[in-house]
C-alpha cells in the first residue's frame, strides 16, 4: 500500500494521514524528516545532503529520490508507506517512476479555497498550552479567551488571511501539473487516482478512505 497525498493546507490531509497510519500500520514519510534523520545518522547520503545544505543550496531531486529509496526498504515500510509533500514537481514524479518506486494510490483532498480560508483564518490559539479553537466550528466558551485559564487567544501569523491566500495560489500552481500527471498515470493503469471531497465530516472522509484502501 504505497500512497501519495495531495491537498492544500487546511484540506484535512494531516488528520486523514493519521487515520491511515493507525488503521493500516504504515509510516508517513516526510522528506524533511528523512533529510534530518540522514544527516543526524551521518550516512553517506546524509553527509552529501549536509554538504549541500551547509552551502545554502537546495538538495537535488536525485539525492531525495535516493533517500526515499533507502527509507522504503526499512522494516516499517514492509506493508507500504504514505508520502506527504513529495513529489512536488513533475521531474520528481518522473524520477520516482524511473527509480522503480511504484505508487498504488494517489489521494487528492479537494476543498474549495473559500472554505479553506474560513477553516484556517478562524483558528485561535492559546499559545502556552497549544490548545486550538475555531471561531465558528469550535468556539471558546468566552469569545477570545482560553476555556481553562481565561487567558487571551491569539492568531498565528501563518493563519492570517493574506498568508493563507498566498499559500493557496502557490499550492495550485505547484500541484495542478501533478494532478494532471497522476490522472494520466491512472488512465494508463499505472496507479489509482482518487479525488476525495474534503468538505465532509472527518468520519465520513475516513470511511471513504477505508472503502478505497480496503
Swiss-Prot record:
Residues engaged in binding ATP: 10-15, 123, 132-133, 200
PROSITE patterns in UniProt: ADENYLATE_KINASE
Segments of this protein annotated with the region LID: 122-159
Keywords: ATP-binding, Cytoplasm, Kinase, Nucleotide biosynthesis, Nucleotide-binding, Transferase
Pathway connected to this protein: Purine metabolism; AMP biosynthesis via salvage pathway; AMP from ADP: step 1/1
Record's GO cellular component terms: cytoplasm
Residues the entry annotates as binding AMP: 31, 36, 57-59, 85-88, 92, 156, 167
Broad class of where this protein is predominantly found: cytoplasm
Superkingdom to which the source organism belongs: Bacteria
GO aspect biological process, one term: AMP salvage
NCBIfam families: adk, PRK00279.1-1, PRK00279.1-2, PRK00279.1-3, PRK14527.1
This protein's domain notes: Consists of three domains, a large central CORE domain and two small peripheral domains, NMPbind and LID, which undergo movements during catalysis. The LID domain closes over the site of phosphoryl transfer upon ATP binding. Assembling and dissambling the active center during each catalytic cycle provides an effective means to prevent ATP hydrolysis.
Name of this chain's protein: Adenylate kinase
Organism of origin: Erwinia tasmaniensis (strain DSM 17950 / CFBP 7177 / CIP 109463 / NCPPB 4357 / Et1/99)
Amino acid at each position: 500500500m504505497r500512497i501519495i497525498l495531495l491537498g492544500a493546507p487546511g484540506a484535512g490531509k494531516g488528520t486523514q494521514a493519521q487515520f491511515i497510519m493507525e488503521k493500516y500500520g504504515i509510516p508517513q514519510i516526510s522528506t524533511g524528516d528523512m533529510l534530518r534523520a540522514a544527516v543526524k545518522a551521518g550516512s553517506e547520503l546524509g553527509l552529501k545532503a549536509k554538504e549541500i545544505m551547509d552551502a545554502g543550496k537546495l538538495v537535488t531531486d536525485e539525492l531525495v529520490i535516493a533517500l526515499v529509496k533507502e527509507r522504503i526498504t526499512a522494516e516499517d515500510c514492509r506493508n507500504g508507506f504514505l508520502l506527504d509533500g513529495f513529489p512536488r514537481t513533475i521531474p520528481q514524479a518522473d524520477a520516482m517512476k524511473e527509480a522503480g518506486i511504484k505508487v498504488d494510490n494517489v489521494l487528492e483532498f479537494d476543498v474549495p479555497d473559500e472554505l479553506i480560508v474560513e477553516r484556517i483564518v478562524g483558528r485561535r490559539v492559546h499559545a502556552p498550552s497549544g490548545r486550538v479553537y475555531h471561531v465558528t466550528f469550535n468556539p471558546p466558551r468566552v469569545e477570545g479567551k482560553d476555556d481553562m485559564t481565561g487567558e487571551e487567544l491569539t492568531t498565528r501569523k501563518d493563519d492570517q488571511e493574506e498568508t493563507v491566500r498566498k499559500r493557496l495560489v502557490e499550492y495550485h500552481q505547484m500541484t495542478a501539473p501533478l494532478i494532471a500527471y497522476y490522472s494520466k498515470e491512472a488512465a494508463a493503469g499505472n496507479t489509482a487516482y482518487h479525488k476525495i471531497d474534503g468538505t465532509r465530516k472527518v468520519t465520513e472522509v475516513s470511511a471513504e478512505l477505508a472503502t478505497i484502501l480496503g
